[in-house]
A protein has these predicted regions:
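Alpha-helical solenoid repeat scaffolds of the TPR/TPR-like class and their adjacent stem/linker regions
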Residues: 1-497, 502-574
Length: 574
């Protein structure tokens, strides 16, 4: 019992002298004989809460949180102000997935001993699990103020800061975590994630390398290293093979690692290696990020193997509106196989896709589904038809606006006074890559020479762009008239040229067969491939790529020069 007596003497010295984690570390080395003696002491002295607390800790670290709760509740009944027991009880409640009870325990521990750091730390962990990032950040900082050398608090603070996009601060926190425990792989990997978010790609690779030096089978580090190398490869193409090798290492280390398969799929698809990429793309359904859109159907998945003659198949949208527009083209091929075809898409696309060849019925998502023999998500159709770069179907116009909407827009726009150019410069603000792919209008305006008839087809103009739009009276703002994609399609047809960033509008305009110039950020989406100015998916598209992330002067200068050539202005008659 010497170890027990020494530990309890330390606890008795006063508030803040011993933390929960230190206690766990000390009892981890106790022999079974010590625990047997402690159990006997607990029987002989049932009112001693410390004995019950230590037994509860042992149950907690032995993976028995239910038993820990029982023992710790008894300890607290004898000693309600036992902050270390309250902390342990909170941990046990969290392990049993009882977050509200866990939070109450941590709050009581803080109340009884506000000088302890670990109740703040464990409460921060609970807040983190609930997605309450800002509250978690506050508690991690409280923990660090009391325990400056608690490595895991610095590490987890960095993770929370990364979650809210405060990457420079995350780098600072994770750098401190690495200093405190340089021989542990996890902080190095997490530092790499923060550096990646801050755009410091080379340093991110170095951090992942250090993590892999410590743990060569660290699948997450290998996967993240692949992502950083892949983004570096936009400026340094020779890094692509190393990125793919990193994904392979992640898969070898963790054969069911869906994120590595997903990232490798995106890389292969972006390089046009469709034969390898489409099968791997099916791993998307195992990703946590896809759980909200994964669906169960009463019919089997069709991936091209079964005959569709005389069968009914449901094709359904799954991701963005642009994806539905891009991949609905396969409907005609499905119908040619003798199928009765039902196409389910977002309600805003139903009217537009009525012009598509192939579907017998187009329905809005959420409507009652007819009986079907098979189903297929739209982005699985390229796999089903073994698509490669030379057999992409319907690369020219495959959608058209309703004739009555076309007449309406022709009348609304009136006679053309000069070459008419439609503009879209930003996409959905909620898109995870919006800060890279969208433009500020003031960035675009200097590259739009006067003399053209510009039409803003930007449905939602952001507050910061309104003043700049009003300052250019030669740009007609028609965004408020675009009630759905049928209206937008009719407006597009009345343009001589569409200039857009990478949004669903780009897919719509190109699917209509209209000349569409697309400004692409670096890195760009896999759908636009690499190192080319055209798209095999859309004959009428022309791509203006960034070569350096965030640098729009290059692609916009090329676009302005091309505009003079493609749509030369003629002098008005005298």
């Amino acid at each position: 019992m010497q170890e027990v007596d020494a530990l309890l003497a330390d606890v008795a010295r006063g508030a803040g002298c011993l933390e929960h984690g230190e206690v766990l570390e000390r009892i981890r080395s106790w022999q079974q004989s010590t625990w047997d003696a402690l159990s006997q002491e607990a029987i002989e002295f049932p009112l001693n809460g410390n004995f019950l607390w230590l037994q509860g800790l042992n149950a907690l670290q032995s993976g028995n949180p239910a038993n820990a709760v029982e023992l710790l509740c008894q300890a607290i009944a004898h000693h309600p102000s036992h902050a270390l027991a309250q902390t342990a009880l909170g941990q046990a409640m969290a392990a049993l997935d009882l977050p509200a009870a866990a939070m109450e325990c941590f709050a009581l521990a803080i109340h009884w001993n506000p000088d302890l750091g670990e109740p703040f730390f464990y409460r921060a962990n609970a807040l983190y699990q609930q997605g309450r990032w800002d509250a978690a950040i506050d508690d991690y900082r409280q923990a660090i103020a009391r325990r400056p050398t608690l490595m895991q608090a610095h590490n987890n603070l960095g993770l929370a800061l990364t979650r809210v996009g405060r990457h420079p601060l995350a780098v600072d926190s994770l750098s401190r975590a690495v200093e405190l425990d340089p021989h542990r792989a996890e902080p190095h990997c997490n530092l790499g994630v923060a550096l990646f978010g801050a755009g410091r790609l080379r340093e991110a690779v170095e951090s992942y390398d250090r993590a892999l030096d410590i743990d060569p089978h660290y699948a997450e580090a290998a996967n993240n290293r692949g992502n950083a190398l892949w983004d570096l490869a936009y400026a340094e193409p020779e890094r692509r093979s190393a990125a793919l090798a990193s994904y392979d290492l992640a898969i070898a280390s963790k054969p069911d690692y869906e994120e590595a398969y997903w990232n490798k799929a995106l890389a292969l698809l972006q390089t046009g290696e469709y034969a390898q990429g489409w099968p791997l793309y099916e791993w998307r359904w195992r990703r946590r990020a896809f759980a909200p859109i994964a669906r169960n159907f009463d019919c089997p998945l069709w991936l091209g193997l079964e005959s569709l003659q005389g069968k009914t198949i449901l094709l359904h949208g799954e991701q963005g509106l642009g994806d539905s527009i891009q991949f609905c083209r396969y409907a005609a091929l499905v119908q040619e196989m003798g199928a009765q075809l039902v196409l389910e898409v977002d309600a805003c696309l139903v009217g537009l896709l009525g012009s598509l060849r192939g579907p017998d019925q187009v329905i809005a998502r959420g409507a009652a589904l007819p009986r079907a023999d098979f189903h297929c998500p739209l982005l699985s159709l390229p796999l089903a038809f073994q698509t490669h770069l030379n057999n992409i179907p319907a690369a020219s116009a495959y959608l058209a606006p309703a004739p009555e909407r076309l007449i309406h827009w022709r009348q609304m726009l009136g006679p053309k006074r000069a070459p008419r150019v439609g503009l879209v410069w930003s996409g959905d603000p909620a898109h995870r890559n919006d800060r890279n792919r969208s433009l500020l209008l003031k960035t675009l305006l200097p590259y739009l020479p006067v003399g053209y008839e510009y039409v803003s087809l930007q449905k939602d103009v952001r507050e910061g762009d309104r003043v700049d739009l009003a300052a250019r009276p030669d740009i007609r703002d028609m965004g408020q008239a675009l009630s759905d994609f049928s209206e937008t399609a009719a407006a597009c047809v009345e343009m001589d040229l569409l200039i857009t960033v990478d949004t669903s509008f780009a897919h719509l305009s190109a699917a209509l067969g209209k000349p569409t110039w697309i400004l692409l950020s670096a890195p760009s989406d896999w759908r636009w491939l690499l190192d080319r100015e055209d798209s095999p998916w859309y004959n009428s598209a022309r791509l203006f790529r960034q070569h350096i992330t965030g640098e729009w002067d290059g692609p916009l200068s090329r676009l302005a020069y091309a505009l003079h050539t493609y749509l030369p202005l003629t002098e008005p008659a005298a």
